Amino acid sequence: MPLTRDFKETIQQRARRDGRFREALLKEAVDALLAGDLDTGKIVLRDYINATVGFEKLGSATKRSPKSLMRMLGPRGNPQARNFFEIVAYLQKKEGVRLKVRAV
């Protein structure tokens, strides 16, 4: 289900001013992907990118076109693990966090 523009704007505004919220968004995206929920993970990751670095800057950092990154994380996108982890590594560095995977 697509999010309404007002909701996306609310997410972006909060992410711009709240570092813990940004960290939680990034963690939520990775958690969803690791749990096998690719669709939710991609949606949350796109929202995170749009609210923080943007696809232009991410494209420059990863040497990929912003449109390619948007397609990769779009509804029909299927990112390769190498691309996904390169994106996550850059976002962690940019955010100043280090996510860890733990068995529960």
Q: What are the roles of these predicted feature ranges?
A:
Residues M1-V44:
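N-terminal flexible/basic segments that precede or flank functional cores
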Residues K63-P79:
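Recognition helix of helix-turn-helix/homeodomain-like DNA-binding domains
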Residues L33-L34, I49-V53, E95:
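Short alpha-helix boundary/capping elements
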Residues G19-E23, L38, F55, G59-T62, ...:
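Alpha-helix N-cap/helix-initiation sites
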Residues K42-L58:
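Short basic helix-loop element that most often maps to the first helix and adjoining turn
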Residues R16, L34, G74, A89-Q92:
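Signal for well-folded cores of large energy- and translation-related assemblies
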Residues K93-V104:
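Short C-terminal boundary/hinge segments that cap the last helix of small helical domains
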Residues R76-A89, K100:
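Short, basic-rich loop-to-helix N-cap that marks the start of a DNA-contacting helix
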